[in-house]
């Protein structure tokens, strides 16, 4: 417990908020009579309640400090009084170390929306990209299809598609590059697309807008034809099958629509 005191003190000094996992076994470890005492000892922001707590205990604790519930196991109708009387109620999805055990999108969305409709903030996990946690080292995402993609891409999908309230990195390591991209979006609201262009280099570092009438299968750039010079010719080049994620520009065969991206 001495190491925990040192670690938590340092984290608080650095401006972090600490969410501590606690169970009834934690009382024995710290030799205290309530988990609220643990929260005071370590100066944590919120407690994530594991197994062993009855509803009355959760309600009493929720009135004193933020608590985090397991999003996968709680029933909304059972925690209405916690939301009504508690200081702050959050629900955290699990992360899944083993491949093929992460949540599917439909189930995740159903749970997330029902919790948010009840006034509960939802937290989910993305994998790291530098240091993966053992013993399996396959990432710690909430959603299975995030397991082998970049933390930035996983963060953007959780934020923009699923509208989760907070995103945590499950693994111990995430690169400075990925942190910078995530922070940039949080600061500016602009989505960064890392790409190497063989042509149309004038698009580098340009901020463009997605057309609001883009269909679900493509994203059209609003300013694309405005960026094309009047006398510019776009010859056919690399006219292969367009894979998911491909960025293409219409060539001269599209006549006055040439240049659309």
Where are these regions (language model features)?
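Active-site beta->alpha loop and helix N-cap motifs at the rims of alpha/beta catalytic domains
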Residues: 1-84, 88
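Catalytic alpha/beta core domains of metabolic enzymes, predominantly
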Residues: 70-199
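N-terminal start-of-chain detector that recognizes signal peptides
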Residues: 20, 63-64, 95, 137-141, ...
